[in-house]
Swiss-Prot record:
One protein family per Pfam: Rhodopsin_N
Region (Interaction with SAG) residue spans: 330-348
Cysteine pairings via disulfide bonds: 110-187
Keywords annotated in UniProt: Acetylation, Cell projection, Chromophore, Disulfide bond, G-protein coupled receptor, Glycoprotein, Lipoprotein, Membrane, Metal-binding, Palmitate, Phosphoprotein, Photoreceptor protein, Receptor, Retinal protein, Sensory transduction, Transducer, Transmembrane, Transmembrane helix, Vision, Zinc
Function comment: Photoreceptor required for image-forming vision at low light intensity. Required for photoreceptor cell viability after birth. Light-induced isomerization of 11-cis to all-trans retinal triggers a conformational change that activates signaling via G-proteins. Subsequent receptor phosphorylation mediates displacement of the bound G-protein alpha subunit by the arrestin SAG and terminates signaling.
Source organism of this protein record: Otolemur crassicaudatus (Brown greater galago)
Gene Ontology process terms (BP): absorption of visible light; G protein-coupled opsin signaling pathway; G protein-coupled receptor signaling pathway; visual perception
PROSITE patterns (UniProt xref): G_PROTEIN_RECEP_F1_1 (PS00237), G_PROTEIN_RECEP_F1_2 (PS50262), OPSIN (PS00238)
Modified residues (Phosphoserine): 334, 338, 343
Family: Belongs to the G-protein coupled receptor 1 family. Opsin subfamily.
Protein name from the UniProt record: Rhodopsin
Chain positions recorded as Zn(2+) binding sites: 201, 279
Underlying gene: RHO
Amino acid sequence: MNGTEGPNFYVPFSNATGVVRSPFEYPQYYLAEPWQFSMLAAYMFMLIVLGFPINFLTLYVTVQHKKLRTPLNYILLNLAVADLFMVFGGFTTTLYTSLHGYFVFGPTGCNLEGFFATLGGEIALWSLVVLAIERYVVVCKPMSNFRFGENHAIMGLVFTWIMALACAAPPLVGWSRYIPEGMQCSCGIDYYTLKPEVNNESFVIYMFVVHFFIPLFVIFFCYGQLVFTVKEAAAQQQESATTQKAEKEVTRMVIIMVIAFLICWLPYAGVAFYIFTHQGSNFGPIFMTLPAFFAKTASIYNPVIYIMMNKQFRTCMITTLCCGKNPLGDDEASTTASKTETSQVAPA
């Protein structure tokens, strides 16, 4: 084995020379230089500084403007809540541990950090799935006369939390476990060992199939059908001007959604899958650290893509920030008209 396994950790460094120490008790400076740990801390500080205000602003603006409290926006707000979970439950902890060079909060703290980070990420992922299904049902109309209402939105929210907990909670109760990963300053699911005592292999397979591949398939399917439907409507010259404009907006949103999702999560999932399927292979701590920390940028991408591109929300946000005035001069009528014009195909 090219790593060192302990009772509740796996360090990707051979202990042939006897230098490996528990990541819960000693700085891990034999894995990387101290300045590299400082860089991780600076990176986490940047994510906190950017991620907290933009996600908090999303919630605040929605509370201030009643017209934003629509069923579809409930799902979008769920993304902001998920990102705040990641910021407070994961990023702040990782910032502190990176400054110390090891996971100073012990196994219990590792469980909590891993749980909140996983929970936030999964809430966001399943929120995107619900959003994709809603767009598919509204635009493609597989069910005639369907209207996405408040009850559907609430059911969608409950679904995202159930699925997120179904992924994040099992390691806390004995099915798999959370351990420090990479440079040992943040915690995640144990992809490194089979650990039969906690049935780790079955959980990782379950997690990849149910909580990664299936959501990815649903997102691709729904938005693929959505683009096809819009193109077909445009080709038939149905409401030509409106449809042509909607086609551009939907295509742009689909491309950004898919690319952002893949950029954020495929590197992490790919490395995790490689580590899991190549038990005992030789890899360094940076190999998992970079994709794990890069995936955390989703807390910034989500509000920018799914909230900031909403014309009505953007107008309300500017009005809130400018103490009730909109220096851009977008009046209520034009905003409402724009929303109505593309309500069937563009983000609400």
